[in-house]
Amino acid sequence: MPTIEEILRAAKEAGASDVHLTVGIPPNMRVNGNLITMDYPKMLPADTLEVLVNIMTEVQRERFEERGEYDMSFSIPNCGRYRVNAYKQRGSVALAFRLVGTKVPSPEELGVPESVIDLYQRKRGLVLVTGPTGSGKSTTLAAIIDKINNNRDAHVITLEDPIEYLHQHKMSMVNQREIGIDSNNYANALRAALREDPDVILVGEMRDFETISVAITAAETGHLVLSTLHTIGAASTVDRVIDVFPPHQQQQIRVQLSNTLEAVISQQLIPTADGKHRVAAFEVMHANHAVRNLIREGKSHQLASVMQTNRKLGMITMDEAIVQLYFEGKIDREQAIQFAQDPDSMENKI
């Protein structure tokens, strides 16, 4: 069986974003969204266990045994940096590797809209980047952090599980804390961050009521807070945040969110027309007066209408972004319909 380094290098040469190791089949890699079997022997329990032992410290292995899963990062010189999730299945070890890369892409390279890039200048408020797993949320946030780092005198604290992109101290001071190593959980790390004189706080994921509550408070008290949610679309994102809270608190949270939210950016990665790459589609909602009123009044279902009538402010719905990609020839009709929020309407538009 080849070493994990050989497997990951081969996958990178093939343009893979992810590599999966599990017992009973050869290693698999994901290329442009498609899962492909690699040309290696089937993996035995001893093979995946050996990979685990080689990439983890003793402390990390102990935590893996306790929890049954473990998130970490792993680097190979002259190859790349990987986000790794190790987990148990049928009593054996399985691992998922995601290539992160060593250089933070610029927003322009990612195709991030200019109105989103400009968010790096904000001094306070809540910015949410949302989308399904593997849609590039953490890369978009890393690009915004890098923009801040290159252009602002700021103290940036990132809370990540695990740390993906490594930021050097440039114009800003960037302190990166890994959940499970530098702090026990997001909520505790976020509370501590408020006592560490930050200007900008990145929360890798708003997973629970406690973290969301502290994040909103942090944005209220004069910090720029950046985070992610696994939602698609501004309306579902607002609803998700509100619904985390018990009914008797929801009106208060609507008011707080309407005052603190700066923008919601939702993204999806869509296969290109030639099938060789993927291109990002971005929905962008900036919190202007109309948006804040709708959030306060619990009328999130009307947010799409505000976005459609405020294109000049940099707003765009997901389906409008997909239509734009289609008419630019970047994606085909089938993919446009498949990734649309309203497939029936999309069929009529294209």
Spans of model-derived segments:
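Short, flexible helix-loop junctions that flank or precede catalytic/ligand sites
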Residues: 1-350
